[in-house]
Design a protein with these regions (language model features):
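Conserved short hydrophobic patches within well-ordered secondary structure
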Residues: 1, 49, 83, 94, ...
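Small/polar loops that bind or transfer phosphate-bearing groups
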Residues: 24, 82-83, 139-140
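Short, flexible loop segments at the rims of nucleotide/cofactor-binding pockets, characterized by
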Residues: 57-61, 83, 113
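A structural signal for short, well-ordered beta-strand elements
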Residues: 14, 59, 84, 171-174
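Asp-based, Mg2+/Mn2+-dependent phosphohydrolase catalytic module
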Residues: 71-78, 87-189
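N-terminal helical cap/lid subdomain that shapes the substrate entry/recognition surface
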Residues: 1-68, 72-76
C-alpha cells in the first residue's frame, strides 16, 4: 500500500503524504481521492496505484494465522464472503492464495456506493442467501464498523489489521479467535 502510494507521488507528482491517504483506507479508492482533493487526477493516480499494488501483491504476506482460521471456518460450513475496497484484480489475486471457497466477493462498483454505505454488505448477504441478522462482518477500519451497523450486521474488529478499534466494537486479537466468537450455525441448503 505504501509502495503504491509512493509510486503515485513519484509518477504523478502528488504531494499528499501517505499518512493522509492511510487515514482514509477502507473506502473506495475514488472516494479517498475525492476526500483528499485529488479527483482531478483520479484516472492517472488510480492507474499507477493499481498497477503498483498488483505488482507488489506477492510481496505482501498474509496476516499470521489467517489461512488456518479461514480454512477451519470453511470446513465447518460457515459461508465466507469478502467485502473490500480493493480493486477486483488485486482482490482476485489475494483470494487465489487461500484454499477456501468465498461464496461472494464484493469490490467497488460504480453502480453501488462503497463503505461506509451498507450496500456492499447487503449485496453480499443477498448473494450468500443469508439474513443480515445472521451475518458477521469482520473488518479493521472505522468504515467497516459503520457499514456493518448501517446494514444491521454484527461487527467484529480485526485487531491484527490496520485501524484502531471503533468505540464499542467487539475486538478479535488474532485470526484464531474467529472460531470462538459464536458465529451463526451453517444453514442447510
Amino acid at each position: 500500500m505504501e509502495t503504491a502510494w509512493r509510486a503515485v507521488q513519484h509518477d504523478v507528482g502528488v504531494s499528499t503524504p501517505f499518512a493522509a491517504y492511510f487515514r482514509e483506507i477502507g473506502r473506495p479508492f475514488r472516494d479517498i481521492l475525492e476526500r483528499l482533493g485529488l479527483e482531478d487526477q483520479g484516472d492517472e493516480i488510480e492507474r499507477v496505484y493499481r498497477a503498483t499494488a498488483l505488482r507488489e501483491a506477492p510481496r505482501v504476506p498474509a496476516f499470521p494465522g489467517i489461512h488456518t482460521a479461514l480454512a477451519r471456518l470453511d470446513k465447518r460450513g460457515v459461508k465466507l464472503g469478502v467485502v473490500t475496497s480493493k480493486a477486483r484484480s488485486q482482490t482476485a489475486w489475494t483470494l487465489s492464495q487461500f484454499d477456501v471457497e468465498f461464496g461472494t466477493v464484493q469490490t467497488p462498483e460504480p453502480s453501488c456506493p462503497g463503505k461506509p454505505a451498507p450496500y456492499p454488505l447487503l449485496v453480499a448477504a443477498s448473494e450468500a442467501r443469508v439474513d443480515v441478522r445472521d451475518s458477521v462482518f469482520v473488518g479493521d477500519m472505522d468504515v467497516d464498523g459503520l457499514a456493518a451497523r448501517a446494514a444491521g450486521m454484527r461487527f467484529l474488529h480485526a485487531g491484527w489489521g490496520y485501524g484502531a478499534r471503533p468505540a464499542g466494537a467487539e475486538q478479535l486479537r488474532a485470526p484464531r479467535e474467529l472460531g470462538e466468537v459464536g458465529l451463526p450455525a451453517p444453514m442447510a441448503a
